[in-house]
């Protein structure tokens, strides 16, 4: 790939950028709207500091996938419009024509038009490997009784902790955070390392990534056997504008044709991939996500955020 350019998601640049890029105008199959997708540059909407998904140093898995797509779709380069993934993220990026695709978006969210899903994962339980909790696969396991479990407040697994009688001793971590100044996932894994908590429940991609970054050895167990209750497994798509029908079809073809390569990227970042039967998807070498080494650029990522932000953002966990 050629050099990657960066675009900040500032309001002042919206009109200038919208007027400056060479757009492809394509009639919609229904209605008179046109598509404004840059034919030369893959323009990606991203969070500036939210590993393992993305950061401004372009070390995230979304950015690795973007580079793959740009290469396969013959784009000259990749550019990023950065904005914290919170209320206003879609409006300030994709909706303002600053970028043409959100690489990771939960299936079914009506703020964007979804492509076909390109991976499926779940919330996961993390605990020390070969420790007292070895073999635990569900929140209801008696081994977790009287244990202190870290949980992101307001996420679906909290229902299962309450059902198992574990919520009273649980340590809550914030869901609504500014990803540029706080990191609930890293804090939780750090607390697991110090013994402040005995286990952690996190969104799968975060669980896998931060467990890999940690000095200690951890087991990451996708929560797929919890019984009736809120969904814990979700399909993840790419998000595009409602008017961009041909662009969606282009991305769907790319997902179909390069699914294997996309899987390898996700697994390398620690994402516990699941098929539709909740069975783990392995790498081409037969390894699990936790057995694969992190990409070198991901190992070097600074996951501590600079204290210079004011907006409130949320971890990109699916809403269930």
Each language-model region and where it sits:
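Bacterial N-terminal signal peptides
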Residues: 10-20
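Ligand-binding clefts/hinges and TM-proximal coupling segments of bilobed small-molecule sensing domains
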Residues: 26-29, 34, 156-177, 252-320
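Extracytoplasmic small-molecule ligand-binding "clamshell" domains
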Residues: 27-105, 109-110, 179-182, 269
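Periplasmic-binding protein-like
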Residues: 47-48, 120-132, 212-255, 272-296
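Bilobed "Venus flytrap"/periplasmic-binding protein-like clamshell domains
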Residues: 48-52, 56-72, 125-184, 205-206
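Acidic, polar ligand-binding/catalytic clefts
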Residues: 67, 71, 79-143, 154, ...
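Alpha-to-beta junction loops
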Residues: 75-77, 94-104, 147-148, 188, ...
